[in-house]
From Swiss-Prot:
Subunit composition and interactions: Forms a cylinder of 14 subunits composed of two heptameric rings stacked back-to-back. Interacts with the co-chaperonin GroES.
Broad class of the protein's primary localization: cytoplasm
Gene name of the encoded protein: groEL2
Residues binding ATP, per UniProt: T29, L30, G31, P32, D86, G87, T88, T89, T90, G418, N482, A483, A484, D498
A GO CC term assigned to this protein in UniProt: cytoplasm
Function: Together with its co-chaperonin GroES, plays an essential role in assisting protein folding. The GroEL-GroES system forms a nano-cage that allows encapsulation of the non-native substrate proteins and provides a physical environment optimized to promote and accelerate protein folding.
Name recorded for this polypeptide: Chaperonin GroEL 2
Length: 548
């Protein structure tokens, strides 16, 4: 495909125009009085959202240079979302401010490489200042405030804080699994699952012990974990006899249980001879093996697998796991109070954390995080309902963002919200870091850009941005504008805070992309095809569908 090339100022201005188009659509959502954006979908109802990265992903521009500029800013939003789970709009606003001021100085004759170095040094200093100013999250109220701001609903923030405590063993835990599900009921309900839950239920409905609830409840069972299929009852019989003699029920988790092995278990369950439940192992392939091993560690058992030289025929009771209780429905299995040793569980948790750090795949990281949380302390489910499908999607998305926001707060602490932490951290740049020339210009660009989130929040609230920024810059540390009321207050005391991880990630990612913009000297893009060039021959004459 033929290419078109733009150089120098033309290249940078094309990129900037794309950035501005995207940023202008995103920044109207910032702050408590920010607006929503409606996104048309190819099918189904439109989506209404105030999430920066969701809006950014939907924007596709026609001009090739503008399209590249927009794609670069999408990367800012996406990277911030990946790292911190929120702050995508703040990152976009910062990127726009840095690029605008930077390009103005480059056009006036400044050296872009010098400006880039100045920006990088300034961002490093501001990041250090933010981390110093961060306060650890110590109470449920602080988490509720942080999550409530992100979700734009204090009641939802309180539910998220309650969920984090419930699955964190009575303390805040960033590894807690909190899932958000759509519900037919109205409002938000919290359901906490103690222990480990995975999404596989009993293989046969005959295993149910409570026909009203359609669930099988096993008290103090043995747990048999098998990596392959079980079909031959002769392989299983020696172990079954030993379990029967112990008087305990048996949970079997394997790739599958079929044929005479399944029918024998069902018949004995119906007759009341022996209580057991067979469940398919969760996941597929290598992920299934890993999850089986997780369950083995949690329950104090071993996975029966030829790979480690173990077979069903020779298996004995010490190889089986145990738990205080197991509840199996048609859809999922919950293991409560596994008998695994704390040291082994902690070792497994640390191993999964290392895998998360080394993974390049978002999907793999998500699955590893799920495994981590199941081992680290249970699962909380927030069930979300709303009057319409459009409202339900918007609400669910908002709550998912708030959950990630809360976890980020636990991880690195919180700072004053409302764009105030960035503006007040800018004081470390007052002497231009004792730099000179173009590097000092880069520092001044960052100092000016740090006021942009607060100014945008003020603008969205109908206030004069410049006046608000001047007023806040003169206030004591941590005091600033409560845009919801228009008052100037101690933000931390008022529960208006942001996770420092979100704030610093937004700044670092915005600065990274801004530096690329400023140092760009040429842009190579695909040459746009003339309208209709990609269509079928004769499409114009035949209505585009061969005359049909």
């Amino acid at each position: 495909m033929a290419k078109i090339i733009a150089f120098d100022e033309e290249a940078r201005r094309g990129l900037e125009k794309g950035l501005n188009t995207l940023a202008d659509a995103v920044k109207v959502t910032l702050g408590p009085k920010g607006r929503n954006v409606v996104l048309e979908k190819a099918w189904g109802a439109p989506t209404i959202t105030n999430d920066g990265v969701t809006i950014a992903r939907e924007i596709e521009l026609e001009d090739p240079y503008e399209k590249i500029g927009a794609e670069l800013v999408k990367e800012v939003a996406k990277k911030t979302d990946d790292v911190a789970g929120d702050g995508t709009t703040t990152a976009t606003v910062l990127a726009q401010a840095l690029v605008r001021e930077g390009l103005r100085n480059v056009a006036a004759g400044s050296n872009p490489m010098g400006i880039k170095r100045g920006i990088e040094k300034a961002v490093a200093q501001v990041t250090e200042k933010l981390l110093e100013a961060a306060k650890e999250v110590e109470t449920e109220e602080q988490i509720a405030a942080t999550a409530g701001i992100s979700a734009a609903d204090p009641a939802i923030g309180a539910q998220i804080a309650k969920a984090m405590y419930a699955v964190g063993g009575g303390k805040l835990n960033k590894d807690s699994v909190i899932t958000v599900e759509e519900s037919n009921t109205f409002g938000v309900e919290l359901e906490v699952t103690e222990g480990m839950r995975f999404d596989k239920g009993y293989i046969s409905g005959y295993f149910a012990t409570d026909m009203e609830r359609l669930e099988a409840v096993l008290e103090d069972p043995y747990i048999l974990l098998v990596s392959g299929k079980i079909s031959n009852i002769k392989d299983l019989l020696p172990l079954l006899e030993k379990v029967m003699q112990s008087g305990k029920p048996l949970l079997i988790i394997s790739e599958d249980v079929e044929g005479e092995a399944l029918s024998t278990l069902v018949v004995n369950k119906i007759r009341g001879t022996f209580k057991s439940v067979a469940v398919k192992a969760p996941g597929f392939g290598d992920r299934r093996k890993a999850q089986l091993q997780d369950i083995a560690v949690l329950t104090g058992g071993q996975v029966i697998s030829e790979e480690v030289g173990l077979s069903l025929e020779t298996a004995d009771l010490p190889l089986l796991g145990q738990a205080r209780k197991v509840v199996v429905t048609k859809d999922d299995t919950t293991i409560v109070d596994g008998a695994g040793s704390e040291a082994q569980i902690e070792g497994r948790v640390n191993q999964i954390r290392v895998e998360i750090e080394n993974s390049d795949s978002d999907y793999d990281r998500e699955k590893l995080n799920e495994r981590l949380a199941k081992l680290a302390g249970g699962v909380a489910v927030l069930k979300v309902g709303a009057a319409t499908e459009v409202e339900l999607k918007e609400r669910k998305h908002r709550i998912e963002d708030a959950v990630r926001n809360a976890k980020a707060a636990v991880e690195e602490g919180i700072v004053a919200g409302g764009g105030v932490a960035l503006l007040q951290a800018a004081h470390v740049l007052d002497n231009d870091l004792e730099l000179s020339g173009d590097e000092a210009t880069g520092v001044r660009i960052v100092r000016e850009a740090l006021t942009s989130p607060l100014k945008q929040i003020a603008a969205n609230a109908g206030l004069e941005p410049g006046v608000v920024a001047d007023k806040v810059s003169q206030l004591p540390q941590g005091e600033g504008l409560n845009a919801a009321t228009g008052e100037y207050v101690d933000l931390m005391a008022a529960g208006i805070n942001d996770p420092v991880k979100v704030t610093r990630s937004a700044l670092q990612n915005a600065a990274s992309i801004a530096a690329l913009f400023l140092t760009t000297e040429a842009v190579v893009a695909d040459k746009p095809q003339p309208a209709g060039a990609a269509g079928m021959p004769g499409a114009d004459e035949m209505g585009g569908m061969g005359g049909f």
